[in-house]
Amino acid sequence: MGASEEMKVLERVPVSKPPFEYNDLKKAVPPHCFTRSLSLSFYYLFYDLIKVCILFYVASKYIPMLPYSLSCIVWPLYWFFQGAFLGRLWMIGHECGHHSFSNYRWLDDTVGFLVHTATLTPYFSFKYSHRNHHAHTNSLEYDEVHVPKIRKFKSEHLYSEFLTNNPFGLVVNMVFELTFGYPSYLIFNYSGRKLTQAGFASHLYPQSPIFNDSERNHVFFSDVGICIVLYALYRIAIAKGAMLVLYVYGLPWVVMSAFIFSLTYLQHTHPSIPHYDSTEWNWLRGALSSIDRELAGAFNIKKTHYHVVHHLFPFIPEYHAHDATEALKPILGPYYKYDGTPFYKALWREMKDCLYVESDDGPNKTGVYWFKTKT
């Protein structure tokens, strides 16, 4: 990417009132994009399940038979690819939570529950909190995850700047976020919004202030599913050995978690997109404050390419997201943002430069906040 092209990528999106309304966008999307195909959805589900099962079988049966020197090469390759394929399955569970898998909500919840539980994600808990993310995207007060800090004084965030403004500190921070970011979010609400209600904020705690009373039974049901999977892994570890469970399931799960954290982080963290406080935020502004990237095309995770349309119309199935995006681009104009920076470069840049947000200085200072990198 040349210097001029990079400058264009980093150019801020407009924050003025767009010349279109939500209904204008909806009318521009081809009608077939809103159609859920049960056969297509199950095709992609079984296609991904077969890949995961084949890799599980090969890893548990054949890789342990390899010479040690060769297994040291094959195991990391397995962890990476299996983690990516588990991430693909996780995305199908995410689709189910948006009711874009089929026309039957009960079927979506059944498939989503089974898939997410198998990947140690509490389905209903995540579904409810993720719904809040879509309802309050890029709101500094009410968004659900990857909520940036507001810098009010120059003395704030000095530790973060020291940590990320040297290569060693940046690597340490990146490894921590990729390894622990997603499970810490589920367990401790790490990187989540600050809740005004008292109580332990966790996706695993039914009485958490994240949820309302009508959702708590489903949260408990999600916990039961997680406990069943953990118990099954425990029994397999007793029968086959803890090391085999770690290698076949545990480390691919860590890779999957890293994929999930990095994908969601990069879709909402970019120098060109704003965050808003309550004085300036509205739903359309928030939905437009995401970015399309080329992050996981090799693994057929198309939602990473078309995240803007996903926030505008989350019920559009991923296999129609391309057509919907192409139809919307002419209308969105400069309000649409795409960044083709390679995954590893984008992650390094954003974790280095997007430390905190603050409003622009000047007499027209508003509730629009941008990522800043300098003290």
From Swiss-Prot:
Short sequence motif named Histidine box-3, residue ranges: 307-311
Swiss-Prot/TrEMBL GO biological process terms: fatty acid biosynthetic process
Any coiled-coil regions, as ranges: none
Pfam families, A to Z: FA_desaturase (PF00487)
EC number(s) per entry: 1.14.19.-
Function statement: Involved in the biosynthesis of dimorphecolic acid (9-OH-18:2(10E,12E)). Very limited activity with cis-linoleic acid (16:2(9Z,12Z)).
Protein name: Delta(9) fatty acid conjugase-like enzyme
Species of the source: Dimorphotheca sinuata (African daisy)
Upper classification of the organism: Eukaryota, Viridiplantae, Streptophyta, Embryophyta, Tracheophyta
